[in-house]
Amino acid sequence: MINISNILDLTNYAFVLFFGITAAFYFVGMHFEDNKKQYIFTILVFGCIQLIAYLLLGKQTLYTCYPLLIHLPLILLIFFVFHQSISMSIISVLTAYLLCTPRKWIGTLVSSFFGYNQDIANAAAILVTIPLLILVIKYLSPYVEKLK
């Protein structure tokens, strides 16, 4: 059934996917300006995988299987298709994963003022995604990229 909670859940998953793929690509030196087609294709394909898993398997199974459905294939994509070292492929995805945590923290903090309402947590996490991603790209990605 489609309701506001499901829409916020799906939107939050879409934003975290966008954040993770974009951050991981920047960490290996794949900047959006030079790789627009790769970004769009990757986000669309992984978004479809995520949506299908969400609809067929449910939210909890998607959350549990996320490393196998998204992280591992993204590592393999960066390594085999985009020809980055395996160590940088792993580091970029795991660093992006780690940096998704502040989104969740901020969402939880904001929702704590509203009885830990999950819809509020999702909305707050969605709202901080782009500003956080800009900070990560501008201030952190140049340092991670130097690990090559």
Regions found by a protein language model. Give the residues of each.
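Short, charge-rich amphipathic segments
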Residues: 2, 26-29, 39-46
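Juxtamembrane segments at transmembrane-helix boundaries
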Residues: 10, 18-36, 52-148
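Residue-level recognition of hydrophobic positions within alpha-helical transmembrane segments
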Residues: 5-8, 46, 67
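Alpha-helical transmembrane segments
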Residues: 16-19, 38-50
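Hydrophobic transmembrane alpha-helical segments in integral membrane proteins
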Residues: 1-17
